[in-house]
């Protein structure tokens, strides 16, 4: 059957790889629920970026900064009579039931979700990766720094995160998650583009290096299958043509893996004092600058004091884009995160069994 799959397509790297193999074997349409892929204007902008209209793209930056709130604490207890708990869990291995595992808060536990990075952030991660050169699939290394600040609740995933990834050609993706609310909060769910000559695109404005005066740009119209995400999916199914999907299985996989790798780094991180020196950015001045902006918001806006607060700083994780495995330092532990353990009876099949 053809499949329209909501984001994120996968909960781990292995699941995505299996989906790619299944699509290749059966030749069906698989369309990801990343609606920006049906936006002809966004496609047109990316065509111009790749053609070098503003010079070479250096950093493609995604933001998932939307206010959320504490989920509190739910006690472990009996499964409600109306809930088929085993079916609800599916492949996820969860020993005991509590109310925060069921809709919607399952997003904030590693067994069932990926945090906002690969929840809402899947949309902006996909756009960020879409803008870099077409021959780039997976990054060769990634890291993340963040934490779960202020709420002191039951959730496990970070509500604040700065992640970055480097691709084989040197292009980078930066990503910012910020969910903690505060007075004057700026909701920021968008993408920005930074070029090697110092220029940048924010919104529909291009800013030359050193200028605070933007020039409105015409995104143009790129090639997409008409009808929006639903209409294009139906058209692709009727035509029996997987290439008509706006956001096919490969793009879904590459975009989700980008988030998984940042999350893997975070999950292997260690606590360091909450200050500007927390990041492991080496000589990457761009990363230090953008992390500094996030830290400033968390300190001055949210009001997180430096004393007795900590960032979780993940290591740089190397990744082989062809083999889809971690290499080098931390590889043993990181590779354990590429495939989740599965609940009996709901095992994700291996590639040879799809």
What are these regions (language model features)?
Residues 86-171, 180-185, 250-254:
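Rossmann-like dinucleotide-binding domain that binds NAD(P)(H)
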Residues 61-101, 339:
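Core domains of carbohydrate- and sulfate-ester-processing enzymes
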Residues 95-105, 226-237:
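Active-site-adjacent bridging/hinge elements
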Residues 56-59, 96-98, 135-144, 172-176, ...:
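Acidic/polar loop patches that form or flank catalytic/metal-binding clefts of enzymes
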Residues 1-38, 314:
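Beta-strand-loop-alpha-helix segment that lines the small-molecule cofactor/substrate pocket
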Residues 153-155, 161-229, 248:
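NAD(P)-dinucleotide binding in Rossmann-like oxidoreductases
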């Amino acid at each position: 059957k053809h499949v329209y799959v909501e984001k994120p397509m996968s909960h781990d790297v292995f699941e995505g790889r299996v989906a790619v193999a299944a699509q290749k074997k059966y030749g069906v349409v698989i369309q990801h629920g990343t609606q920006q892929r049906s936006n002809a204007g966004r496609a047109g902008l990316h065509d111009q970026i790749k053609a070098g209209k503003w010079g070479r793209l250096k950093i493609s930056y995604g933001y998932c900064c939307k206010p959320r709130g504490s989920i509190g604490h739910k006690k472990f207890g009996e499964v409600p009579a109306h809930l088929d708990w085993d079916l609800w869990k599916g492949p996820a291995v969860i020993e005991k039931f509590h109310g925060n595992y069921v809709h919607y808060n399952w997003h904030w536990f590693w067994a069932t979700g990926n945090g906002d990075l690969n929840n809402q952030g899947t949309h902006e991660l996909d756009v960020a990766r879409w803008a870099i050169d077409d021959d780039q699939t997976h990054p060769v290394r990634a890291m993340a720094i963040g934490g779960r600040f202020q709420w002191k609740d039951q959730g496990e995933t970070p509500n604040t995160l700065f992640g970055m990834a480097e691709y084989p050609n040197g292009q980078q993706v930066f990503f910012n998650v910020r969910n903690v609310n505060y007075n004057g909060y700026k909701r920021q769910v968008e993408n920005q583009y930074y070029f090697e000559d110092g220029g940048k695109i924010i919104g529909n404005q291009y800013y030359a290096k050193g200028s605070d005066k933007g020039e409105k740009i015409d995104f143009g119209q790129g090639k997409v299958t008409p009808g929006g995400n639903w209409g294009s999916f139906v058209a692709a199914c009727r035509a029996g043509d997987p290439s008509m999907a706006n956001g096919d299985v490969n793009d879904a996989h590459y975009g989700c893996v980008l988030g998984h790798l940042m999350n893997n780094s975070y999950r292997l991180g260690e606590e360091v004092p909450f200050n500007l020196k927390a990041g492991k950015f080496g000589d990457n001045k761009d990363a230090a600058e953008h992390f500094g902006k996030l830290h400033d918001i968390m300190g001055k806006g949210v009001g997180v004091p430096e004393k007795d607060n900590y960032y979780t700083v993940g290591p740089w994780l190397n990744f082989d884009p062809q083999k889809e495995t971690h290499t080098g330092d931390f590889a043993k532990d990181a590779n354990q995160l590429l495939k989740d353990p599965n609940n009996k009876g709901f095992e994700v099949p291996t590639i040879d069994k799809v």
